[in-house]
């Protein structure tokens, strides 16, 4: 199968986690799928759903380019690497051709960062992927969620839902992130990093 790469959105499966901050990666994959389905020239098909480890689609992200695989691990966050390794092994995707979208406490809502490699910054999904792949050398799309208010507890914050007042900001970030991934697909790391890191809502 000819593919351009693999985009993974991190999150937890189940309705109780829908639109929580920790599921920002899932929301990004959903936004990519919705965008592809609105484009009459884009092909998008589900390759697996309801499997134990992952939901997977093959979609056109850029016209005239080989499709990308879009994945939502269904293993829960701390075991995300098991799903990523299973996909990478079956479809022969190298870590350098992967982008992992995830929530980022160290960035405020409305800000993003794109980078290749690096540490896990305490993110268990990234830690699992690094361990399973045996390398940290994959791209990360860090989607800011901000830190809890003073005295707030981190777990409750990341597992809490975005507020109604956050909706416009979240939508703007997702729209810009899609353009950022298209820039990565067509122009590479440097252009994507410049676009994504400079984004202001």
UniProtKB/Swiss-Prot annotation:
Its EC number is 3.1.1.29. The record marks 12 as: Discriminates between blocked and unblocked aminoacyl-tRNA. It catalyses: an N-acyl-L-alpha-aminoacyl-tRNA + H2O = an N-acyl-L-amino acid + a tRNA + H(+). Pfam families: Pept_tRNA_hydro. It comes from the Bacteria. TRNA binds at residues 17, 76, 78, 124. It is found in: Cytoplasm. GO terms for molecular function: peptidyl-tRNA hydrolase activity; tRNA binding. Its main location: cytoplasm. The record marks 103 as: Stabilizes the basic form of H active site to accept a proton. The active site is at 22 (proton acceptor). Keywords: Cytoplasm, Hydrolase, RNA-binding, tRNA-binding. GO terms for cellular component: cytoplasm. CDD domains: PTH (cd00462). InterPro entries: Pept_tRNA_hydro, Pept_tRNA_hydro_CS, Pept_tRNA_hydro_sf. GO terms for biological process: protein quality control for misfolded or incompletely synthesized proteins; rescue of stalled ribosome. SUPFAM superfamilies: Peptidyl-tRNA hydrolase-like. Hydrolyzes ribosome-free peptidyl-tRNAs (with 1 or more amino acids incorporated), which drop off the ribosome during protein synthesis, or as a result of ribosome stalling. Catalyzes the release of premature peptidyl moieties from peptidyl-tRNA molecules trapped in stalled 50S ribosomal subunits, and thus maintains levels of free tRNAs and 50S ribosomes. Monomer. PANTHER family: PEPTIDYL-TRNA HYDROLASE. Belongs to the PTH family. HAMAP family: Pept_tRNA_hydro_bact. This is Peptidyl-tRNA hydrolase. The gene is pth.
């Amino acid at each position: 199968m000819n593919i351009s790469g693999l985009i993974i959105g991190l999150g937890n499966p189940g309705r109780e986690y829908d639109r929580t901050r920790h599921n920002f990666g899932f929301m990004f994959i959903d936004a990519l799928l919705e965008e592809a389905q609105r484009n009459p020239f884009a092909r998008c098909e589900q390759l697996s759903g309801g499997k134990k480890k992952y939901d997977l689609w093959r979609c056109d992200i850029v016209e005239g380019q080989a499709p990308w695989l879009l994945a939502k691990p269904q293993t829960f966050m701390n075991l995300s690497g098991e799903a990523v390794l299973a996909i990478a092994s079956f479809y022969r995707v190298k870590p350098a051709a992967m982008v992992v979208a995830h929530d980022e406490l160290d960035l405020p809502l409305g800000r993003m960062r794109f980078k290749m490699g690096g540490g896990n910054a305490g993110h268990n999904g990234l830690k699992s992927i690094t361990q399973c792949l045996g390398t940290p050398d994959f791209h990360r799309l860090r989607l800011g969620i901000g830190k809890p208010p003073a005295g707030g507890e981190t777990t409750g914050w990341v597992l809490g839902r975005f507020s109604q007042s956050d909706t416009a900001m979240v939508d703007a970030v997702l729209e810009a992130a899609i353009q950022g991934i298209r820039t990565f697909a067509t122009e590479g790391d440097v252009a994507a990093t410049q676009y994504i890191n400079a984004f202001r809502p």
